[in-house]
């Protein structure tokens, strides 16, 4: 009974169905009841928002100053061209940022295959349509900036950088960047059974990417990210700084000073030393009667002692608990 309460079932990979190069369906079971939605939702959020990728962020088109323009001889308006450029599936090797160029003249459809790039860039969807030239004299020339990032970053989130460098952005058309290579991720939880238990979960994940990242690799990365984020909880410990209590002295510092600091007359000082009264704390605990019993200490010396103590807001007959303190050594 104890093992069934404290031990959890470990799911196994039941099936990987490769629907296409960019589309995969993965089934995991058995999972404890409720764990299907827990893991499925966590993986879905990470896959859609945290997978790194490359996206078009800026475009310069010859003769175009803003996105609300049209270009003679081009069927699409500029906004539509920018939306088409957002659909490029680009893989870059060894760099975080690259520039691509596109120059096309004459009647015909302009596709991703017409983009000029180096050996460190791979465009997956070469047949992706960018625009259409409708006459012999029509031409289009553009410079495309591609950057690495994560998730979805709208232009408005970059306004601070742009406002600080306005002169550098003249003629540049900014594009909302969709970096995520994961285009679709859905999951469903079905019933699973192990021996007599029928309340278990089966997690079915179906995912599509744009081709720049293998679907199975995407799930492995998402699981690794989730595992790394949770690792701190495995080794959870109290890292709060201990509260340092300010230690208040148990006794007034003046009580720890020797009686010589009272600058009594030689007669009075010698009488106190003869009675082994070395510290002011020793002295203030004595009563007048006790001091008058001290040999050679008369009323004149007693009056002197009382006056000196009064000047320091002290008096005879005081009760000091835990006296003497540990840091005082008897002379």
UniProtKB/Swiss-Prot annotation:
Enzyme Commission number(s):
2.7.7.6
- All disulfide bonds of the chain are none
- A single GO molecular function term of this UniProt record: DNA-directed RNA polymerase activity
- SUPFAM superfamilies for this protein: C-terminal domain of RNA polymerase alpha subunit, Insert subdomain of RNA polymerase alpha subunit, RBP11-like subunits of RNA polymerase
- Judged by the first EC level, this protein's enzyme class is transferase
Q: Which UniProt keywords apply?
A: DNA-directed RNA polymerase, Nucleotidyltransferase, Transcription, Transferase
- One biological process term in Gene Ontology: DNA-templated transcription
Q: Which Pfam family, giving just one, matches this sequence? A: RNA_pol_A_bac
| Highest taxon listed in the record's lineage | Bacteria
Any coiled-coil ranges, and where?
none
Q: Which InterPro entries match?
A: DNA-dir_RNA_pol_insert, DNA-dir_RNA_pol_RpoA/D/Rpb3, DNA-dir_RpoA, RBP11-like, RNAP_asu_C, RNApol_insert_sf
The terms describing its cellular component in GO are: cytoplasm; DNA-directed RNA polymerase complex
- CDD domains cross-referenced by the UniProt entry: RNAP_alpha_NTD
Record region (Alpha N-terminal domain (alpha-NTD)): 1-237
Q: Which reaction does it catalyse?
A: RNA(n) + a ribonucleoside 5'-triphosphate = RNA(n+1) + diphosphate
- Give the start-end ranges of region Alpha C-terminal domain (alpha-CTD): 251-331
Gene3D superfamilies per the record? 5' to 3' exonuclease, C-terminal subdomain (1.10.150.20), DNA-directed RNA polymerase, insert domain (2.170.120.12), RNA polymerase, RBP11-like subunit (3.30.1360.10)
The free-text domain remark for this protein reads: The N-terminal domain is essential for RNAP assembly and basal transcription, whereas the C-terminal domain is involved in interaction with transcriptional regulators and with upstream promoter elements.
Q: Which NCBIfam families match?
A: PRK05182.1-2, PRK05182.2-5, rpoA
Q: How does it assemble?
A: Homodimer. The RNAP catalytic core consists of 2 alpha, 1 beta, 1 beta' and 1 omega subunit. When a sigma factor is associated with the core the holoenzyme is formed, which can initiate transcription.
Could you tell me what this protein does?
A: DNA-dependent RNA polymerase catalyzes the transcription of DNA into RNA using the four ribonucleoside triphosphates as substrates.
Q: So what family is this one in? A: Belongs to the RNA polymerase alpha chain family.
Name of this chain's protein? DNA-directed RNA polymerase subunit alpha
Q: Which organism is it from?
A: Buchnera aphidicola subsp. Baizongia pistaciae (strain Bp)
* Taxonomic lineage: Bacteria, Pseudomonadati, Pseudomonadota, Gammaproteobacteria, Enterobacterales
């Amino acid at each position: 009974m104890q093992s069934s309460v404290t031990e959890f079932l470990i799911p196994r990979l039941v099936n990987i169905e490769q629907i296409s190069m960019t589309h995969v369906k993965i089934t995991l079971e058995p999972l404890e009841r409720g764990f299907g939605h827990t893991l499925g939702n966590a993986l879905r959020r990470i896959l859609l928002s945290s997978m790194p990728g490359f996206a078009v962020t800026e475009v310069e088109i010859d003769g175009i100053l803003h996105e609300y323009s049209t270009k003679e001889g081009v069927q699409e308006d500029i906004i539509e061209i920018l939306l088409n450029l957002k659909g490029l599936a680009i893989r870059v090797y060894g760099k975080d940022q690259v520039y691509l160029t596109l120059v096309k003249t004459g009647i015909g459809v302009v596709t991703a295959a017409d983009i000029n790039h180096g050996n460190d860039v791979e465009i997956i969807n070469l047949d992706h349509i960018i625009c259409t030239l409708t006459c012999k004299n029509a031409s289009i020339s553009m410079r495309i900036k591609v950057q690495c990032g994560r998730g979805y970053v709208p232009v408005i989130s970059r306004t601070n950088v742009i406002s600080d460098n306005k002169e550098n952005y003249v003629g540049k058309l900014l594009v909302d960047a969709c970096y995520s290579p994961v285009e679709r991720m859905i999951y469903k939880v079905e019933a699973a059974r192990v021996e007599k238990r029928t309340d278990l979960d089966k997690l079915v994940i179906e995912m599509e990417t744009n081709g720049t990242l293998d679907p199975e690799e995407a799930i492995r990365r998402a699981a690794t990210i989730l595992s790394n984020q949770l690792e701190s909880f495995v080794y959870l410990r109290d890292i709060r700084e201990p509260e340092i209590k300010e230690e208040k002295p148990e006794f007034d510092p003046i009580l720890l000073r020797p009686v010589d600091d009272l600058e009594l007359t030689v007669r009075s000082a010698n009488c106190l030393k003869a009675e082994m009264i070395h510290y002011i704390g020793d002295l203030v605990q004595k009563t007048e009667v006790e001091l008058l019993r001290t040999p050679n200490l008369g009323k004149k010396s007693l009056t002197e002692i009382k006056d000196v103590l009064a000047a320091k807001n002290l008096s005879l007959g005081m009760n000091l608990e835990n006296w003497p303190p540990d840091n005082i050594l008897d002379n």
